[in-house]
C-alpha cells in the first residue's frame, strides 16, 4: 500500500525533473502559490489542472492521485519541452553503425534536431527518402520527414526499424513483422514487396520519433 501523500508525489516528480515551482506553475497555468499548496497537501489539483500537471511532470494522473507505480513509465511530454538534441546522419553512416566503434563524429555534424522522447545518447536522426513508407491510409511516414533511431530499444514485432541488409551499403527503413517464426521487413506502401530476413540482416535501431523537417 502506498502511504505517500499526493503532495509528496508532486514534489518528488518536480524535484526529479529539476523544475522550479514558479516554472511548473507557468506550465500548468496556475500560480506558484497553488503549486506550493498542492505540494503541502493543503489543496489538490483536479480536472484540467490535474491533466496539465501530469503532462508537465511526465506521469499519469493515476500516479499523482493514487501512487500507481505501474503508471510512472507513462510519459506525457509537452511539444514545447525538448528532451534532447541528436545529430542527423546519412544512411551510409547508419549502415555502418554496427561495425564502427564510433559511427559518426558528433562534433563534425552540423544538423541537430530536438525530440520530446526519452532515448539513449547514441540515438540519431535520418531523413526519410523515397515513398516505400508512404501508406495510402493509416500510419504513413513520407519523404520530407525525419526519424529518430534508438539503437538501445529492443526490436519487437510491429516496430518501425532501421536495418542493414547483407551486401547493402546503406541502411533501410521498414516495419518489422514476425509471423510463425519468420521475420520480414515490411514497407508501409503496399506497392513495395516485403523482404524476408533470416540472418542476412542486422537491426540497427528502433524508430522512436518522427517529424516533418522539410516542406516541399
Curated annotation (Swiss-Prot):
Record PTM: In the mature form of the repressor protein the initiator methionine is deformylated.
Keyword annotations from UniProtKB, A to Z: DNA-binding, Repressor, Transcription, Transcription regulation
Gene3D superfamilies hit by this protein: lambda repressor-like DNA-binding domains (1.10.260.40), Umud Fragment, subunit A (2.10.109.10)
Disulphide linkage map: none
Gene Ontology MF terms in the entry: DNA binding
Short name of one Pfam family: HTH_3
InterPro entries, alphabetized: Cro/C1-type_HTH (IPR001387), Lambda_DNA-bd_dom_sf (IPR010982), LexA-like (IPR039418), LexA/Signal_pep-like_sf (IPR036286), LexA_repressor (IPR050077), Peptidase_S24_S26A/B/C (IPR015927)
Stretches assigned to the HTH cro/C1-type domain: 10-64
DNA-binding region positions on the chain: 21-40
Coiled-coil portions: none
Site entry: Not N-formylated: 1
Function, as annotated: This protein allows the phage to reside inactively in the chromosome of its host bacterium. This lysogenic state is maintained by binding of regulatory protein C2 to the OR and OL operators, preventing transcription of proteins necessary for lytic development.
PANTHER family given in the database record: LEXA REPRESSOR, LEXA REPRESSOR-RELATED
Protein name (database record): Repressor protein C2
Organism whose genome encodes this protein: Salmonella phage P22
This protein's encoding gene: C2
Amino acid at each position: 500500500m502506498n502511504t505517500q501523500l499526493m503532495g509528496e508525489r508532486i514534489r518528488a516528480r518536480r524535484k526529479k525533473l529539476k523544475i522550479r515551482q514558479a516554472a511548473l506553475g507557468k506550465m500548468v497555468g496556475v500560480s506558484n502559490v497553488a503549486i506550493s499548496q498542492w505540494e503541502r497537501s493543503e489543496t489538490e489539483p483536479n480536472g484540467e489542472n490535474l491533466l496539465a500537471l501530469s503532462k508537465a511532470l511526465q506521469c499519469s494522473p493515476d500516479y499523482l492521485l493514487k501512487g500507481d507505480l505501474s503508471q510512472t513509465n507513462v510519459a506525457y511530454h509537452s511539444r514545447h519541452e525538448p528532451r534532447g538534441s541528436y545529430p542527423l546522419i546519412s544512411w551510409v553512416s547508419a549502415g555502418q553503425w554496427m561495425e564502427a566503434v564510433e559511427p559518426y563524429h558528433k562534433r563534425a555534424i552540423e544538423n541537430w534536431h530536438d525530440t520530446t522522447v526519452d532515448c539513449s545518447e547514441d540515438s540519431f536522426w535520418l531523413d526519410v527518402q523515397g515513398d516505400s513508407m508512404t501508406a495510402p491510409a493509416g500510419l504513413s511516414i513520407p519523404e520530407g520527414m525525419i526519424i529518430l533511431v534508438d539503437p538501445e530499444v529492443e526490436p519487437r514485432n510491429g516496430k518501425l526499424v532501421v536495418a542493414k541488409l547483407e551486401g547493402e551499403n546503406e541502411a533501410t527503413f521498414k516495419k518489422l513483422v514476425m509471423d510463425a517464426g519468420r521475420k520480414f521487413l515490411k514497407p508501409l506502401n503496399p506497392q513495395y514487396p516485403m523482404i524476408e530476413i533470416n540472418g542476412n540482416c542486422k537491426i540497427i535501431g528502433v524508430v522512436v520519433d518522427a517529424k516533418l523537417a522539410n516542406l516541399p
